[in-house]
Amino acid sequence: IQIRLVGSEMCIRDRSNMLMGPEFPWYFLPDKVTKGDGNYQFCHNFILSGKVVSKFVTILDPFIKKLNMKRVIRIKANKTFKKSSNIESKMHIDVTRKEDEKFKTAVFYCNTNNGATLFESGKRVESKENRAVIFDGKTLHCGVDCTDSHRRVVINFNYIDE
């Protein structure tokens, strides 16, 4: 698990501001991880199963280049809202791949809040603007809702870099 800044602060802030702005389209999902979990979120899919599904995908070009993505499996943004406690979603992996296929997951934090990404090992990575956590795509992890900001916005990247 590695944590790093992703790029030029101004470049990244412009893109994050677009996602945080009122013109960006978000879609309601009644379940965050599994059907019936009751932990809703809003989502915007950019790439699904390697196919572009959003006209906004070009805002991600600097991330794709910086993270040296050779093949993108999926990219989506998640938006959750302030809760009364730091609720953890169910541990999961983002995408299912062949047993021997190596891929990475990166979670980019668009805003700073007391939410986090939690790993099965117990490691916790706080949501800090302009930072990403990168890890083996088969690592169990979960999102933790925030209590100190109106919203928590992240971009999830699943990709192959070899």
Regions from the PLM with identified roles:
Residues R13-L29:
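A short, well-structured alpha-helix characteristic of acyl/acetyltransferase catalytic modules
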Residues M18-E23, T34-M91:
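Signature of the catalytic double-stranded beta-helix
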Residues N86-M91, E101-F103, Y109-K128:
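A short beta-strand-loop-beta hairpin characteristic of the jelly-roll/cupin
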Residues A106-F108, S149-E162:
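A short hydrophobic beta-strand segment most commonly corresponding to one strand
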Residues G122-C142:
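Conserved metal-binding segment of the jelly-roll/cupin
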